[in-house]
Amino acid sequence: MTDYYEPINIFRQCAISVKKRGQEHGLDVATRRVASWQRSAKLNSPTLRKVSDDYFLTKKVKSDYWQVSDMDLSATAFSSVGNLVMVTSNKDQDNVKLYTYAEDPNSMRQLQTITVPGAPITTATLLPAAEFNPTAYVPDHEQLLLTGHRDGIVNLISTSFTKGESRIVKRYNHRKHLVSMANEVMNIDTKHKDEIEQLLANHKQKSNSARAMPVRSIKPWNGMGFVSLINDSLFVFTLNNTKTPQYLNSFPGIQSFAIQTHSNPYLLGLTGTHFGANNIALLDLKKTLYIPDPVIDKEYRKSSSRSVSSDCTWISSCYLAQALGKEVNIWDVRRTDGKPKAKILPNKGVIEHLSYHYETDTLFSSDDQGNIIAWDLTNLDRLEYCGLVHGLDAVKYNMNLPINDSNYSQCGNVVVNGNNNSACTYRKLARKIEVNQRAGTLFSYCDHELGLHRLFSAPVEISLQLSDTETINYESEEEEVMVHVDKLHDNSHENSSILHSDSTTLHSRDFDSYSDNESANTTDNDNELAYMDTFKRPVPAFLDEKVAAYNNPVLSSSSSTLAYGYF
């Protein structure tokens, strides 16, 4: 037994793996396998392409356009589900057309033409077959759709592509509910009863006219019904109940609504002129009919009270995007301070339509000048202000906002430029947009033109053409660095360009020419010092040695020191 403490011998797994050593001439020699990625057979693998410097990826857009209606008649609405597209017009005959498109090759083919009787169509939408079963109403039918008319009627239509037949299976009359609601309100006892009776009498007289009840918007709701907007009244109908709506309320000044389809379809976002200074409110269909007044910030009220909110869309279960004039505000519904989570700065025209693609976290906006812009909101949690990637608007800051490099992101790319010779530009019309969630494509419609837009990453090769350059080889124990240095001009006031091995371009000047020349002008020295201060860093040492390399062509590798990766 030993006279010192010895721990218990417990088996432990090695943390590292050591290769076996071979015996050569009685000495332990470690076997080493030298491999290079240049001799690898996977030169075209995605992993190696990411670290190479001969190309870079850029976002590009591919657009296809089709003429789907007559030049003298404009379409009233369009909708898309899967590879199916519907376009409606205000004609009496053939006012609903269904198309199908294929991505490879890009083609658009007309499936069916439907004539819906009654008043002109003002809006329409396709119902997803996965949520709304068309065979529950008519056997062997493949698609359900809703059409809203000028007289306040909404028709549920079932159609079959194979048989070529269509049928109106349900009809929802909104006008009669608005008239009965006005009669009930007239029985309210108030000191302003005479004025209210006069207003409601005028409202009732207008309600009897078919032209006073256009259906402004229709959206599918919770796989069982739809939400519709007529004038200032919001309806919620189930498809099986045509007599009584599940919900009905009037919101003066309402412009649009958005249904939260992620987790709570009973939560709606509303935009309008009477929803506080921010022109936005939340509506919970499960709670009492009450819209709380938001907390208004004085500074924010001055900048937003003059704008009109035209559209909104849900980004997630907590974030709601709102078009407010030329800006887009992204709200966090969990906050109560009355300030947006992020703001897309003003650009182009007044934004009228919004659409969001959930898989790629891309928000599309359309303005009254025919422009469509895609906003990358992947890092939404860290965003405060968003701007365009290209153009003068990308670098133009609003001096009234606390914008800096840390909270500003250039994430906007122009998909459709409104400066082209299109009908939307001449007539100042906004392109109606809708994202196909399954295919990830964007549909746009303006006047008679239907567009299909797709964003993709395209590789761009890098070709560097350097003239009058010298090559300095720097050898070390670990690697060999090749640095291309442009020749310095004799005129010290001219700029020279230095290209490092990491493809970073730095514009500098010949600083040593001023320090060696005692007769230099004081004004020039001040200008050069001010130019140096813009870098906010000390001048690298290799700039001095670069000048020495030009004056003395013989430069030993041992005396050169390169600040690799300094900038």
Curated annotation (Swiss-Prot):
One of its GO terms (molecular function) is G-protein beta/gamma-subunit complex binding. WD repeats lie at residues 68-109, 127-167, 302-341, 346-385, 398-437. The keyword Cell division applies. It comes from the Eukaryota. InterPro entries: WD40/YVTN_repeat-like_dom_sf, WD40_repeat_dom_sf. Keywords: Cell cycle, Cell division, Cell wall biogenesis/degradation, Repeat, WD repeat. Involved in cell wall metabolism and required for the separation of the mother and daughter cells. Belongs to the WD repeat DSE1 family. This is Protein DSE1.
